């Protein structure tokens, strides 16, 4: 009887050990499987499966509707009209915000930069519309948290501000001074929002055009040969280090784009002219105002 009971106890012990082992193994696989699912959720982009519209066709349609020429070299934005196109803006915003960092990292440099410029400019419109009507973008926010520090959109899964795109990504990743004439600040003193969205295939040409257009607009930049002065936008003061990465002086960079003869005699003399920074007009670039 004792041997029988002993055998039963031994069998029960083996059964308990087996059940414990099975339970532990099951928990292990659940955790592993769960971890794999979490990894997939965090980065569900698979290389070679990029479905992003790099022509930005929806955004281009919006730009066609709201960007209005105000001078031969300048344009404004019809913010009231843009505000009315809520569904279009929601779709554009959703397309930009759903891009993951893994997907972004799989793109070419030109695709990345075109995306960031377009995202910055579109989100600038969104910021103005959120607070519209305003007299200036600088009226948005507080003394301590200005418009460019307002966290109001999602990028790569986190809530971001405009400064993150410009300083945390574009200026950090790309040594490209011409971006300062592609990024807009919703003000009359800043470069105009172009009628054509930025695309990878034409990016160099588009950046050149935007730079040349702004530098040749005498409302922002001009040469005073009589006074031997070169009047430049304050953009050149704020981002002087960026421009000097590829030029010996601010004069050299500016004159390269100010006209076909700016670096030829007698224009070449302007290389030695004193730089004077023009007043910056922070009034909203609204065609309604």
What label would you give each PLM region?
Residues 28-117, 121-289:
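Interaction/scaffold regions that mediate signaling and macromolecular assembly across diverse proteins
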Residues 19-29:
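Hydrophobic alpha-helical membrane-insertion segments, chiefly the h-region
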Residues 2-19:
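N-terminal Sec-pathway targeting helices
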Residues 10-11, 22, 150, 271:
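Intrinsically disordered, low-complexity, compositionally biased regions/tails
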């Amino acid at each position: 009887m004792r041997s029988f009971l002993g055998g039963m106890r031994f069998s029960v012990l083996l059964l308990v050990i087996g059940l414990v082992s099975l339970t532990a193994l099951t928990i292990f696989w659940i955790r592993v499987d769960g971890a794999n699912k979490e990894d997939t959720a965090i980065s569900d982009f698979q290389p070679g499966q990029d479905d992003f519209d790099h022509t930005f066709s929806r955004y281009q349609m919006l730009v066609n509707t709201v960007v209005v020429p105000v001078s031969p070299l300048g344009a404004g934005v019809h913010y009231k009209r843009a505000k009315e196109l809520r569904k279009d803006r929601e779709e554009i915003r959703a397309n930009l915000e759903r891009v993951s960092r893994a997907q972004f990292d799989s793109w070419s440099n030109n695709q990345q930069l075109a995306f960031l410029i377009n995202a910055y400019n579109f989100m600038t419109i969104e910021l103005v519309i959120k607070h519209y009507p305003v007299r200036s973008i600088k009226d948005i926010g507080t003394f301590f948290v200005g418009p460019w520090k307002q966290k109001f959109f999602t990028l790569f899964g986190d809530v971001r501000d405009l400064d993150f795109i410009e300083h945390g990504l574009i200026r950090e990743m790309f040594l490209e001074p011409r971006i300062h004439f592609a990024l807009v600040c919703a003000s009359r003193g800043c470069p105009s929002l172009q009628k054509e969205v930025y695309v990878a295939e034409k990016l160099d040409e588009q950046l050149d055009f935007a730079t040349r257009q702004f530098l040749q607009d005498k409302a922002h930049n001009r040469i005073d040969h009589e006074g031997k002065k070169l009047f430049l936008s304050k953009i050149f003061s704020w981002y002087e280090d960026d421009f000097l990465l590829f030029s010996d002086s601010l004069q050299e960079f500016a004159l390269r784009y100010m006209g076909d003869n700016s670096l030829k005699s007698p224009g070449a003399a302007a290389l030695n002219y004193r730089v004077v920074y023009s007043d910056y007009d922070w009034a909203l670039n609204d065609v309604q105002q």
